[in-house]
């Protein structure tokens, strides 16, 4: 079974630099390399009857699905695992973030065993059928109530106005809250939602969730509801695996926060001291505790300190996306799926338009085996070479990333101006052409970087003996 542990970042439209809603997640796996691909699922290719590979759970799907983008596993042996996308109504979804639970709720509504739905399924069963972020929450809530789940998961939905974050609770329950427009969220692999208001329209939950809390005396707080306290965890593992990631992101946006990496009650809803850009998210998704003793590539800490906390940028990043719904362009241009394959510390993210019917071959045709024509496999090769001597290769990678992202920005700016009056198939053709241009320049720059790394590394091999003549 595929292992998936991720990091999610959400940014409201008034907190972002350009007024976009932004939902981002790194899809991280385990020891096995899980090749990823980028595809468009057309309505005629969406199944009408769905069957999960992992559990065999069968679901009859509604008619008239929407077109949507998807980042499925290339080999499919564990199922689709569509991960994230934006549909033709400019509604985005990312699923899922593996989260934690506790024995109290598991004794009431246990996770299913060998049945129900999970990360493999949720995007495929939800994204083609929703027309707003709120609809996404309600759709998943209905699926959980009917089919249940075998794992604890968090997921996010966005449209041009709203972002919602949902967490599953036990086998059939859930809770969700709308992210304030002027706030951001970082969600590591634990149950993250804290303060919860059952009376507010900015919160949604299973119909009987509040009753369960009361009937089983689950609330440890004297006032209000904190779902992390009620349904979540506060373990030693959280203090080194989860909490430090939230701490690093929150201190990046506000260095004056009075928290430590070990704190169990780091806030869910946070306000930055400046507007947040896509570039900020890219940096954080690639971060490894730079300028702290906990940076594995740094020179501040001891060997023990460098291995103490789990970073966001890690060898197990297999794909990372930032789903951007823009508010300053026509609807046909609004959806942008920033996408990077492989460890984020060594890749460059590409801003693909999502109003398309196909994707560039270098991102689409990954294949399950090593393939030098696939950007996924090139990025894996580059990251494993770069990891051998980060001090030597790190600046080369930074220059590559800036060069590539800047070139993609130029293509995006030019395309936005050129297609303002276009619609339908003509617009899609121009956006597809722009996507291909960005994919091609990213591929070429990646190959160029690999060449520079080989040239630079030649004289630094351990297998050497200096000439004496």
Residue ranges and their predicted role:
Residues 18, 29-32, 41-48, 58-60, ...:
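C-terminal/peripheral segments of proteins
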Residues 400-469:
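Histidine-centered catalytic/metal-binding microenvironments
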Residues 136-145, 281-285:
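Short, well-structured alpha-helical segments that form the helix of a local strand-helix-strand
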Residues 123-129:
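Short, well-ordered beta-strand elements within core beta-sheets of diverse protein domains
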Residues 2-119, 139-259:
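A contiguous strand-loop segment
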Residues 129-135:
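Short, charged, surface-exposed loops that flank catalytic or proteolytic processing sites
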Residues 294-422:
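Substrate-recognition/cap regions that form aromatic- and gly/pro-loop-enriched pockets
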Residues 191-340:
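Ordered core of a single globular domain
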């Amino acid at each position: 079974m595929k292992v998936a542990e991720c990091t999610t970042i959400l940014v409201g439209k008034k907190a972002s630099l350009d007024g976009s809603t932004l939902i981002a997640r790194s899809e991280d796996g385990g020891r096995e390399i899980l090749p990823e691909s980028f595809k468009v699922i057309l309505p005629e290719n969406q199944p009408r009857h769905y069957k999960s590979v992992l559990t065999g759970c069968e679901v009859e799907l509604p008619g008239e699905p929407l077109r949507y983008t998807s980042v499925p596993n290339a080999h499919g042996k564990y199922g689709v695992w569509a991960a994230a996308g934006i549909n033709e109504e400019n509604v985005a979804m990312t699923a899922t973030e593996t989260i934690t639970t506790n024995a109290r709720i598991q004794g009431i509504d246990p996770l299913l065993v060998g049945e129900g739905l999970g990360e493999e399924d949720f995007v495929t069963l939800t994204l083609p059928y929703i027309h707003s972020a709120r609809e996404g929450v309600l759709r998943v809530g209905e699926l959980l109530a009917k089919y249940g789940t075998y794992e604890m998961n968090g997921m996010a939905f966005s449209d041009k106005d709203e972002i919602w974050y949902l967490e599953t609770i036990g086998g059939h329950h859930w809770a969700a809250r709308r992210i304030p427009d002027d706030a951001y969220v970082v969600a590591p692999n634990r149950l993250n939602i804290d303060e919860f208001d059952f009376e507010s329209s900015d919160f949604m939950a299973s119909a009987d969730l509040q009753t369960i809390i009361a009937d089983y005396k689950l609330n440890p707080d004297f006032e209000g509801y904190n779902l992390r306290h009620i349904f979540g965890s506060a373990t030693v593992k959280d203090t080194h695996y989860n909490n430090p990631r939230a701490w690093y992101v929150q201190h990046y946006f506000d260095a004056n926060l009075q928290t430590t990496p070990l704190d169990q009650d780091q806030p869910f809803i946070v306000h930055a001291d400046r507007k947040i850009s896509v570039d900020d998210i890219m940096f954080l998704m690639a971060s490894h505790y730079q300028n702290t003793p906990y940076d594995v590539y740094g020179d501040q800490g001891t060997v023990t300190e460098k291995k103490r906390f789990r970073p966001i940028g890690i060898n197990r990043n297999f794909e990372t996306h930032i789903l951007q719904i823009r508010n300053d362009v026509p609807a046909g241009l609004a959806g942008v799926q920033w996408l990077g394959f492989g460890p984020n510390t060594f890749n460059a993210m590409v801003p693909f338009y999502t109003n398309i019917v196909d994707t560039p071959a270098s991102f689409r045709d990954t294949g399950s085996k090593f393939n030098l024509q696939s950007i996924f496999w090139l990025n894996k090769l580059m990251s494993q070479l770069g990891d051998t001597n980060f001090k030597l290769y790190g600046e080369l990678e930074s220059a590559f990333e800036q060069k590539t992202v800047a070139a993609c920005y130029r293509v995006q700016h030019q395309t936005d101006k050129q297609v303002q009056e276009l619609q339908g198939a003509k617009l899609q053709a121009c956006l597809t052409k722009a996507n291909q241009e960005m994919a091609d320049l990213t591929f070429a720059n990646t190959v160029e970087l690999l060449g520079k790394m080989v040239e630079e590394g030649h004289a630094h091999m351990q297998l050497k003996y200096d000439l004496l003549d």
